[in-house]
Amino acid sequence: MAKQKKFSGKGSARSKRKQNRKQVGPRRRVEFKYKGFTLGELQEMPIKKFMEIVPARQRRSMKKGITPKQRKLVMKIKKARRLANRGKDPRTIRTHCRDFVITPEMIGLPFGIYNGKEFIEVKLVEEAIGRFLGEFAPSRKVVQHGSPGMGATRGSMFVPIK
């Protein structure tokens, strides 16, 4: 019978952390906070105060004011929010405004964001606050090049085709 190594108590830090971790009951979800504010506080907050806590790029964009297209989007958001408060399921809000900053009142609403070809369906969650709509609908496709065809390289010019 082969000798077994005695456990000397020395193990990797990872195994020690695993042993110390005790899971009792189901994991509870930590309440969402954005820069120290809960979602409820953010929704009650005036837009001027919200502008102070978002990053500089978004703040500069909001400071410029809203364009007529963005104003139309705000009206659609308010209409959808009223429907959602009544208990009805709001329809997807389709928009071309990719440069619109996501505010707390938009959370939970379905959006169709145009990527230049089609509308990408997105349901906004709390983690999206303070980002631009365009970040959730990539406008460029990642190119995946295939293998080169016959005659694409000089070495393959004189290879007989099967």
UniProtKB/Swiss-Prot annotation:
Gene: rps19
UniProt biased composition (Basic residues): 1-27
Pfam families to which the protein is assigned, alphabetical: Ribosomal_S19
Protein family according to the UniProt entry: Belongs to the universal ribosomal protein uS19 family.
Any one of the GO CC terms: cytosolic small ribosomal subunit
Keywords: Ribonucleoprotein, Ribosomal protein, RNA-binding, rRNA-binding
Purpose: Protein S19 forms a complex with S13 that binds strongly to the 16S ribosomal RNA.
Protein name: Small ribosomal subunit protein uS19
Region spans: Disordered: 1-29
Record bears the keyword rRNA-binding: yes
